[in-house]
Every structure is written in structure tokens, then in C-alpha cells.
Amino acid sequence: SLLRSLAPEDKMPEATLFETRPAHWYFERPVLGATRKGSQGDQLYVADNPPFGAVISYYLRDGYPTQTAARQETESERLEAGNTVAFPGWGVVEAERRETAPALRIVIRDEGGSVIKRLDAPTAKGLHRVAWDLRHPYYGSVETPPNWQGLSPSGFMVKPDADYTAELALIVEGEARLLSGPVTIRVNRMTSPALQGAEIDE
């Protein structure tokens, strides 16, 4: 399990992308109706299902705060210790205003090594989980808002019974750096069709 692979914090690298469980490939469908409870009313209790797709876990030893957040944390520690805090200077304030916040991306690649999706990921210190919905990005010539159910347009499903890879990358001031990975994501068809159809590649 994931917890068994964790080491003491002082021995952990800067970032660790953990191996993932095989993901089940299927099409979600509503059971009670178009909305969560359908027409059953609020007396019906429902709970969230586990995230659909491949759940990708990673650990950040220190996190990647913005310059403003790092300065404010240092100032808070000084105030808690009973010390005063000085104005950092206009140069520092202007640099913080112009800074582009560090960003983490989980990069999904297919068997040929081509990038098929990039997932936004939290940059805070600690353990995080991000779910990939097993879909390509949505490409539309016109921006389409979410529908009345709050669902945004999505891309096509990826091919089942195939291996994909995930990498964890950090982007700071436009420069990307690989932190961890790649790890393999196996996508398995959940059920076999009753009738034999065409090959999935067709």
C-alpha cells in the first residue's frame, strides 16, 4: 500500500510520485435521474462515490509557496516569538506582485510517449491525491460553459487495456522541471462486451 512505501520525512526526496492501482475503464451513468437524487427527494441519503478514473498520489517534502506566502509565514513566526516585523521594502513587494505562482502538473503520456493530458496539482507540503478521469482534454473552437447540471465539456475516453505513464513536474517562472516519475498507470476494461465488436483501435 501507499503507507508502506513512505519513509521517515528526513529520508524522503523533494517529491515522490507513488505507483497507482489499475484503473477501471467504463462509462459512468446516472442511476436515479439526471441529478444526484433524481426525483427521490431529500429523504433519500446518498454519498459520494470514490473518484472515477486513476487516482494518482504524490508527496511533497517542503511544498512550493509563493514569495508572499513564504514571507508571511516567516513574519508570523517572528510575531509569535514576540519580535517585530519590518516593512520588506518596495522592491520586495513589487517582485511579489509580479511573481507567477509556482505550479505543479501531472503529465499523462500514452504508450508512444506523447502527452495526452496535463492535470493541475496542489503545491502545498504533504500528501496529495489527484484523479485522472481517463479522458483526453476537450478541444473546442468555442468556449462552452457548464450545462445545467454543472458539467463541463470533456474529451474522448482513452483506449482501455493499455498502459499510460504519469510524471510530476514543477513550473517556476515558466521553467519546467521533472520532480518524480514516470510511474505506470494500467487502464483495464471493467467488463467485456456481450457481443464481439471491432477492435478498439478502429
What are these regions (language model features)?
Residues 1-202:
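C-terminal low-complexity, glycine/proline- and small-hydrophobic-enriched intrinsically disordered tails
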